[in-house]
């Protein structure tokens, strides 16, 4: 469970604790799980989830994935549910699906995966057959239907790929759909997609040293009732690199923190 102390540790670098609404602070004090509602449905999700594009992906490509099993179990044991992955994350999607199946935890996970069958760097339209094949593979390796969320990765060929996942949602095979962009230069395209398509989620990068999404994307998402997945909230390792070798400030001891990590 994410408690007040845990969240303050996560927020120490961002100053976010001073901006929290009173309802959220009250939840911390009561040691309640901190959640946010998906605007389109009202379904609550814990505010902290698990990504799989970096360290998770590297370990997934190794022979011993027991550490990943422990990570997923720890997430679920503490009330988390969201696991974000993608076919392009090496073995991450397949291995996380195997772990969920082998441990009997598949149905406890909110699976968020992606689709992008556009040839890398080509700018060509996606082949509809390849789009459908990639989607069917995600159903197969994650072993859950309906899948909770599938997003078009990096705004790639939205007419083709958004069309495909919209059809699957209408068929009841996907619960939520969306799109992602981690490139601020493409945020105007993301804004337009948010207005043009009936999406439930977007995914963007946001960290204390990367707040571009807060200028237009996050306010627009709020206005349109679109849920947001935040990627790399610590800038991968940037924030920890900047504090390497620095003493933890005295005020951090007030919530039991003795390390920047």
Q: What feature does the model see in each segment?
A:
Residues 5, 155-261:
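Beta/alpha (TIM)-barrel catalytic core signal, keyed to glycine-rich beta->alpha loops juxtaposed to Asp/Glu
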Residues 54-65, 115-128, 254:
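Active-site mouth loops of central-metabolism enzymes
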Residues 130-151, 171:
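CE4/NodB-like, metal-dependent polysaccharide N-deacetylase domain
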Residues 47-49, 82, 108-112, 146-149, ...:
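Structural preference for beta-strand elements that scaffold enzyme active sites
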Residues 62-74, 126-140, 184-192:
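Short, acidic/polar
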Residues 58-59, 86-94, 118-125, 153-160, ...:
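Acidic-and-aromatic substrate-binding clefts and catalytic sites of carbohydrate-active enzymes
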Residues 1-109:
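N-terminal binding-site loop/beta-alpha segment at the start of enzyme catalytic domains
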């Amino acid at each position: 469970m994410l408690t007040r102390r845990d969240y303050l540790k996560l927020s120490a670098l961002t100053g976010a604790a001073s901006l929290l609404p009173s309802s959220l602070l009250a939840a911390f004090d009561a040691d309640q799980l901190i959640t946010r509602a998906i605007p389109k449905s009202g379904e609550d999700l814990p505010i902290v989830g698990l990504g799989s594009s970096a360290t998770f992906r590297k370990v997934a490509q190794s022979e011993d994935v027991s550490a990943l099993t422990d990570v997923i179990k720890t997430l679920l044991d503490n009330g988390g549910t969201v696991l974000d992955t993608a076919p392009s994350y090496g073995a991450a999607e397949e291995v996380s699906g195997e772990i969920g199946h082998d441990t009997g935890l598949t149905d406890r996970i909110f699976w968020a995966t992606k689709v992008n069958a556009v040839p890398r760097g080509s700018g060509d339209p996606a082949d509809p057959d390849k789009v459908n094949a990639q989607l069917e593979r995600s159903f197969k390796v994650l072993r859950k239907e309906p899948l909770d969320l599938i997003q078009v990765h990096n705004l790639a060929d939205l007419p083709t790929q958004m069309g495909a996942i919209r059809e699957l949602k209408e068929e009841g095979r996907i619960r939520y759909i969306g799109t992602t962009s981690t490139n601020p230069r493409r945020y105007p395209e993301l804004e337009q997609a948010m207005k043009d398509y009936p999406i439930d989620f977007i995914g963007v990068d946001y960290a204390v040293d990367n707040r571009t999404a807060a200028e237009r994307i996050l306010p627009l998402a709020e206005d349109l009732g679109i849920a947001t997945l935040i990627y790399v909230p610590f800038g991968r390792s940037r924030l920890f690199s900047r504090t390497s070798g620095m003493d933890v400030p005295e005020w951090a001891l007030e919530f039991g923190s003795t390390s920047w990590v």
